[in-house]
């Protein structure tokens, strides 16, 4: 019976065949232990000399790392194994014998591993992180489908930047200037006025010259937009969504979390509602904690976000930022025009902001004024202004950075490990 490691528990005490790669091996006298992987998981294959004979045993000992095989054996329950099972090998066929695999069991430097990222993703821990990434994506689609959202795909090539930033990748679009998208938000607002509730999932590009463990040049965003949803309701949707994906990872990625040594008790407590602290109170809190490098009107740095997050036992919303710190499209607080109806969701354990969101401006004249204040072309944003001319409604949205979220949930030490092929400052290979 041909099967996969993920399904091997269905065949206890039965003979099965796996298509697999040899991740590692060791031998002890008359027993050889083969660490096998097939993409769905890892399992130990046990080759007993007395059962397979001298010839097969010697073949097993001579197998090279990352050789591809068809392995046949009997499935046994084993509580000590991460998957709960092991395979007593009866025979195997070599599909392709690998030679001089560069990533050996010894320690390697980060640059070496990044140069061999196309191979590094095969390793147990990298595989676990990317499996968790996959589960977050799956749970994202499930959550938004169950809550009545329509998936919409905004363009990646745009003629303008949604936040009026200079951190853009420029290209020529025939005879016009074009830019790689930093956000699909403006297009998603248009889609929300057609479908009510929408979300997108796609790559975004920021030419930031940052070398922190939180930054990538190319990263993936989940961006929902919702018509007839005001600020507080948007926060509720955000916290329910984040709690949903965390619980989905706990349910479906227990082996991966164990492989990574993740403290799951931290994740088990992630349930809505999340605490909220206003920007004003956050500044006061930081001053009380001895931070003298920040004043009202300044944006938070990583140390500030970490200090605020450490005060709470779950993700925390920082709300009502100064208008001067935020993009042009955010709705002002009706009680204070110097702050806007926005929130950043800060993840625990030093992972920083994972969501930025706000209620969007719905008034035509105010939006036009904000565009002018930010020196943005009214012609370029004419279509966006149109949304406020024909049946404008209160609406809100947010963007979740997938890689930072994967990093937090998996406990990965650097955001470069949370995407298969990271694009970093000075790294475009492989």
UniProtKB/Swiss-Prot annotation:
Compartments reported by the entry: Cytoplasm
Catalytic activity: tRNA(Asn) + L-asparagine + ATP = L-asparaginyl-tRNA(Asn) + AMP + diphosphate + H(+)
Pfam families assigned to the protein according to its UniProt record, in alphabetical order: tRNA-synt_2, tRNA_anti-codon
CDD domains: AsnRS_cyto_like_N (cd04323), AsxRS_core (cd00776)
Gene3D superfamilies per the UniProt record, alphabetical: Bira Bifunctional Protein, Domain 2, Nucleic acid-binding proteins
Any one GO biological process: asparaginyl-tRNA aminoacylation
GO cellular component: cytoplasm
Principal place of residence: cytoplasm
Keyword entries, A-Z: Aminoacyl-tRNA synthetase, ATP-binding, Cytoplasm, Ligase, Nucleotide-binding, Protein biosynthesis
Entries under InterPro entries matching the protein: Aa-tRNA-synt_II, aa-tRNA-synth_II, aa-tRNA-synth_II/BPL/LPL, Asn-tRNA-ligase, Asp/Asn-tRNA-synth_IIb, NA-bd_OB-fold, NA-bd_OB_tRNA
The enzyme's E.C. designation: 6.1.1.22
GO molecular function terms noted in the UniProt entry: asparagine-tRNA ligase activity; ATP binding; catalytic activity, acting on a protein; nucleic acid binding; transferase activity
Enzyme class, spelled out: ligase
PROSITE patterns: AA_TRNA_LIGASE_II
Family to which the UniProt record says this protein belongs: Belongs to the class-II aminoacyl-tRNA synthetase family.
Subunit structure, as described in the record: Homodimer.
PANTHER family, per the entry: ASPARAGINE--TRNA LIGASE, MITOCHONDRIAL-RELATED (PTHR22594:SF34), ASPARTYL/LYSYL-TRNA SYNTHETASE (PTHR22594)
Protein name as it appears in the record: Asparagine--tRNA ligase
Organism: Halalkalibacterium halodurans (strain ATCC BAA-125 / DSM 18197 / FERM 7344 / JCM 9153 / C-125) (Bacillus halodurans)
Lineage summary: Bacteria, Bacillati, Bacillota, Bacilli, Bacillales
């Amino acid at each position: 019976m041909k099967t996969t490691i993920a399904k091997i528990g269905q065949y206890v005490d039965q003979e099965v065949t796996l298509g697999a790669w040899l991740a590692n091996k060791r031998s002890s006298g008359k027993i050889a232990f083969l660490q096998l992987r097939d993409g769905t998981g890892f399992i130990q294959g046990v080759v007993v000399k007395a059962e397979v004979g001298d010839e097969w045993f010697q073949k097993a000992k001579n197998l090279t790392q990352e050789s591809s095989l068809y392995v046949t054996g009997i499935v046994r329950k084993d509580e000590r194994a991460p998957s709960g099972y092991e395979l007593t090998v009866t025979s195997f066929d070599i599909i392709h014998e690998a030679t001089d695999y560069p990533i050996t069991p010894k320690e390697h430097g980060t640059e070496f591993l990044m140069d061999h990222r196309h191979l590094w993703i095969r390793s147990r821990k990298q595989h676990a992180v990317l499996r968790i990434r996959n589960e977050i994506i799956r749970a994202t689609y499930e959550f938004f489908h169950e809550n009545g959202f329509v998936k919409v795909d905004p363009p990646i090539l745009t003629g303008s930047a949604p936040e009026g930033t200079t951190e853009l990748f420029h290209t020529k679009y025939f005879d016009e200037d074009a830019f790689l998208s930093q956000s699909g938000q403006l297009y998603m607002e248009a889609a929300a006025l057609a479908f009510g509730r929408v979300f997108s999932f796609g790559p975004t590009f920021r030419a930031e010259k940052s070398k922190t463990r939180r930054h990538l040049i190319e990263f993936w965003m989940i961006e929902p937009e919702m018509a007839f949803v005001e600020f507080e309701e948007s926060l509720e949707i955000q916290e329910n969504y984040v709690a949903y994906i965390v619980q989905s990872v706990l349910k479906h990625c227990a082996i991966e979390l164990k492989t990574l040594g993740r403290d799951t008790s931290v994740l088990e407590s992630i349930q809505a509602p999340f605490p909220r602290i206003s920007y004003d109170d956050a500044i006061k809190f930081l001053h009380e904690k001895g931070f003298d490098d920040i004043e009202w009107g300044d944006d938070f740095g990583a140390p500030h976000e970490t200090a605020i997050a450490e005060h709470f036992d779950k993700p925390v919303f920082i709300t009502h930022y100064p208008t001067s710190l935020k993009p042009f499209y955010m709705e002002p607080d009706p009680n204070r025009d110097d702050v806007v109806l926005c929130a950043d969701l800060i993840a625990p354990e030093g992972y920083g902001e994972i969501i930025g969101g706000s209620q969007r401006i719905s008034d035509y004249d105010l939006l036009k004024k904000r565009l002018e204040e930010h020196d943005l072309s009214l012609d370029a944003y004419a279509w966006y202004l149109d949304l406020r001319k024909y049946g404008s409604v209160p609406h809100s949205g947010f963007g979740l950075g997938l890689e930072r979220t994967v990093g937090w949930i998996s406990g990965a030490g650097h955001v470069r490990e949370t995407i298969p092929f990271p694009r970093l400052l000075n790294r475009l290979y492989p």
